[in-house]
A protein has these predicted regions:
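Penicillin-recognizing serine hydrolase domain
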Residues: 1-136
């Protein structure tokens, strides 16, 4: 993961486990934006991040997992194209949210770190951006 991060230009990120739960791992907002831009290339995965619930089935059909998305903003903020939530006791709440701008090829990438109210803070930030800026 760290090799891939460097290849993406994520020079201030250090992964210590795939889940990101090790408190000694670190990243920056700038590096997370690079990761989000890269991840959006994988539409089949990104599409799942828009769903409140979905089922994943093994290739042989023997195992299924029902997944509930923890993103409480799905269906609340319009035009969400994906997002990722996170929480650890040390990092507190984290949230990455990608919102498409209707009629334009632009997107808002909102990243909240160290929050006690990641969903509320994300909503405030996205609302402020959509109120403060106008796309032509």
């Amino acid at each position: 993961m760290n090799t891939k991060a460097r290849a993406l230009g994520m020079n201030d990120t250090r992964f210590l486990d795939p889940a990101g739960l090790n408190d000694n791992g670190q990243s920056t907002v700038q590096d997370l934006v690079k990761l989000v831009v890269y991840a959006t290339r994988y539409k089949n995965i990104w599409q799942l991040l828009q769903e409140k619930e979905f089922t994943i089935t093994s290739e042989d059909g023997a195992i299924t997992h029902n997944i509930e998305n923890t993103n409480q903003l799905l269906g609340v903020i319009p035009n969400i194209s994906g997002g990722k939530t996170g929480y650890t006791d040390l990092a507190l709440g984290t949230m990455i949210l990608i919102v498409d701008i209707p009629g334009h090829r632009d997107t808002i990438i909102s990243i909240i770190l160290g929050s006690k109210d990641r969903f509320g803070d994300t909503r405030k930030l996205v609302d402020w951006i959509t109120d403060a800026y106008h796309w032509e």
